[in-house]
C-alpha cells in the first residue's frame, strides 16, 4: 500500500497543492510553521476521518475560506482507492471512496491504513491512562469494524448511564439495570480485544525492542482492568457494575469499565512510565509503533503508510539507524527541519526530498 498523490485545496496554509509521492521514502524539510505537519495531517485525516491535532474540523479550513477539499489516491494490491473529502465550516462533511458516498466513519477506515509517530506520542507512556486507551482504540478501530461499532455504542450508553445517575430515582434504577446489561455486553468485547491486541504487541514488540536495544532490554505490555476472568468478562463486568452502583450514584459517574482501564509498559520488569528514562520511554513508543505496523501487515497483507512527524531529531543515532533501516518495504513520509543528522542512514536511491516554505512545496 502506498499513496500515489495528494491534492489539497484550502487546507490549513495550502491554497491549492498537488503532490506526487514516491512509493518509498519521502522527506519534507523546512523550518517550523511552514506546513510540513499539515501534509501528514491531511493523510491521517483521509485514513480515519479525524485529525491527530484538533477535534474541530473547521480548524483544518484555511482561515478565509468556507470549506476545504482533500483527495488522496492510494495504490493497493487488490484495488486502488481514491478518497475525496469535503469539509465545511458549518460542521458538515462529505466523504467518498471511489465515488461511493461514505455514510459512517467505519466505512472509511481500512481504505488507507497509516501509522503515525509524532513527539506527542511520548504521552502514551508518560501521561494519563486516557492516552494509552486512546492508542489502543485507534489501532483497533483501524483493523476491526466491529470494535469501532461496539466502542461507539459503549460510549453512547456510558453517557446515558452517567446522565441517569445524576437524575436518580426509583424508576431510573430500572433503566440503569438495562444500561448495565448493555455496557457489560459491549464493554466485555472491548476488554477482550484490547487484551488480545496487547498479546500481539508482546509477541511482535519483544523482538523489535531487542533489535533497538541490542538485546539489552526486555519489554512487556500488560492490560490493567478490574476484570479478572477473561473467559467470563461480560458476566463479571455486570456483577461489578451492580456492586459499584452505590458509589457511582455518589459520584454521578461510572467507576468501572473499559473507559477506566489502562495498560502497563515495563522494561526489564520496571514500570517505564514511573521509572523509565526518557530514552527508554522513546524506545517503548518506537516499539509500539513498529509493532503496530507489523500487526496491520499480518491482518491485511500489506504494510500501512508510516508517517514520522519531526521525530527523528528526538532520537539518538542508534534509534535513527533502526528506523531508517526498517522502512525499506514501507512507504514512509518524514518531516524534519534538516537532514544533516540522518543523511548518512538514508538510501539516496529510495528517497525523495521536498522543501517546504510557507505553504509551497518544491521537489528537489
Swiss-Prot record:
Q: Which UniProt keywords apply?
A: ATP-binding, Cytoplasm, DNA damage, DNA repair, DNA replication, DNA-binding, Nucleotide-binding, SOS response
Gene3D superfamilies cross-referenced by the UniProt entry: P-loop containing nucleotide triphosphate hydrolases, RecF/RecN/SMC, N-terminal domain
Compartments, record wording: Cytoplasm
By sequence similarity, the record places it as follows: Belongs to the RecF family.
Q: Does the keyword Transcription regulation apply?
A: no
Residues that hold ATP according to the record: 30-37
Principal localization?
Answer: cytoplasm
- Show the InterPro entries listed in the entry: DNA-binding_RecF, DNA-binding_RecF_CS, P-loop_NTPase, RecF/RecN/SMC_N, RecF_2
Tell me one Pfam family matched here.
SMC_N
| GO CC terms | cytoplasm
In UniProt terms, what function does this protein have?
The RecF protein is involved in DNA metabolism; it is required for DNA replication and normal SOS inducibility. RecF binds preferentially to single-stranded, linear DNA. It also seems to bind ATP.
Entry keyword DNA damage:
yes
> Which lineage?
Bacteria, Bacillati, Bacillota, Clostridia, Eubacteriales
Its GO biological process terms? DNA replication; DNA synthesis involved in DNA repair; double-strand break repair; SOS response
Protein name (database record): DNA replication and repair protein RecF
Species annotation: Clostridium botulinum (strain Okra / Type B1)
Please provide, alphabetically and separated by semicolons, the GO molecular function terms listed in this UniProt record: ATP binding; single-stranded DNA binding
NCBIfam families cross-referenced by the UniProt entry: recf
Q: Its domain of life? A: Bacteria
Amino acid at each position: 500500500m502506498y499513496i500515489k498523490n495528494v491534492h489539497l485545496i484550502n487546507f490549513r496554509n495550502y491554497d491549492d497543492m498537488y503532490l506526487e509521492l514516491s512509493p518509498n521514502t519521502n522527506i519534507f524539510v523546512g523550518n517550523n510553521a511552514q506546513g510540513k505537519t499539515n501534509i501528514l495531517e491531511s493523510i491521517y485525516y483521509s485514513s480515519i476521518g479525524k485529525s491527530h491535532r484538533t477535534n474541530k474540523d473547521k480548524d483544518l479550513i484555511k482561515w478565509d475560506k468556507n470549506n476545504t477539499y482533500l483527495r488522496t489516491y492510494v495504490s493497493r494490491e487488490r484495488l486502488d482507492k481514491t478518497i475525496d473529502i469535503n469539509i465545511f465550516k458549518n460542521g458538515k462533511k462529505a466523504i467518498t471512496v471511489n465515488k461511493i458516498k461514505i455514510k459512517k466513519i467505519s466505512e472509511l477506515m481500512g481504505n488507507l491504513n497509516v501509522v503515525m509517530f509524532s513527539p506527542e506520542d511520548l504521552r502514551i507512556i508518560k501521561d494519563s491512562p486516557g492516552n494509552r486507551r486512546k492508542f489502543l482504540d485507534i489501532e483497533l478501530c483501524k483493523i476491526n469494524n466491529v470494535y469501532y461499532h461496539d466502542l461507539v455504542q459503549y460510549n453512547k450508553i456510558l453517557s446515558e448511564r452517567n446522565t441517569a445517575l445524576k437524575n436518580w430515582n426509583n424508576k431510573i434504577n430500572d433503566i440503569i439495570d438495562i444500561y448495565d446489561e448493555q455496557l457489560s455486553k459491549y464493554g466485555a468485547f472491548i476488554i477482550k480485544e484490547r487484551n488480545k491486541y496487547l498479546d500481539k504487541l508482546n509477541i511482535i514488540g519483544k523482538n523489535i525492542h531487542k533489535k533497538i536495544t541490542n538485546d539489552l532490554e526486555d519489554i512487556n505490555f500488560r492490560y490493567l482492568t478490574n476484570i479478572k476472568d477473561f473467559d467470563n468478562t461480560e458476566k463479571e463486568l455486570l456483577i461489578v457494575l451492580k456492586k459499584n452502583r452505590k458509589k457511582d450514584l455518589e459520584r454521578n459517574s461510572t467507576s468501572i469499565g473499559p473507559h477506566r482501564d489502562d495498560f502497563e509498559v515495563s522494561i526489564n520488569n520496571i514500570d517505564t512510565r514511573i521509572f523509565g528514562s526518557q530514552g527508554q520511554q522513546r524506545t517503548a513508543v518506537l516499539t509500539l509503533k513498529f509493532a503496530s505496523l507489523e500487526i496491520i501487515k499480518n491482518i491485511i497483507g500489506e504494510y500501512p503508510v508510516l508517517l514520522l512527524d519531526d521525530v527523528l531529531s528526538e532520537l539518538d543515532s542508534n534509534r535513527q539507524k533502526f528506523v531508517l533501516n526498517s522502512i525499506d518495504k514501507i512507504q514512509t513520509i518524514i518531516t524534519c527541519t534538516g537532514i544533516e543528522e540522518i543523511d548518512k542512514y538514508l538510501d539516496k536511491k529510495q528517497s525523495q526530498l521536498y522543501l517546504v516554505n510557507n505553504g509551497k512545496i518544491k521537489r528537489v
